[in-house]
Amino acid sequence: MESLTMEIIAYDRGHSMDFFCHVPNGTCRLTIYDTCPSVMFLSTLIVNEKCRKQGIGTAILEEVEKIAKESGCDVISLQVKHNSWMKDWYLRNGFIPVADGYNYNNVIMSKFVENIKGE
């Protein structure tokens, strides 16, 4: 896949720092809360359904990992449905289940920044 140009917008909300990452046909939202600065929460990662399996999600996730490292975070955490293809995708990308989610259908998954390859 050719290199994607990613637009990153950082927004300081006073109690948290939000990052919005946009590429053609994909986007994500990240949050670092002042009360838990070592954890970056990945609340959204979306790729246009017609454009999946082209490496866009992986490219976005690589940028998420880069932002986590640069922000001094130790962990990237997210919540996903137990029985979804997304859970399998995150497992293949190094995330591990760490707890049940906020409802019985979800699982919280995390990836330790020290386990991120590159640079």
Description of each model-found segment:
Residues M1-E2, L91, I116-E119:
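Short intrinsically disordered terminal tails
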Residues M1-S43, N48, I67, D100-Y104:
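Acetyl-CoA-dependent GNAT
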Residues L42-L45, L61, L78, M86:
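Generic leucine side-chain signal with a strong bias for well-ordered alpha-helical environments
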Residues V47, K53-K66, R92:
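Conserved acetyl-CoA-binding loop-helix of GNAT-fold acetyltransferases
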Residues S77-K87, Y102-N106:
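Conserved beta-strand-loop-alpha-helix junction that forms the acyl-donor binding cleft
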Residues K111-E114:
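A general lysine-centric signal
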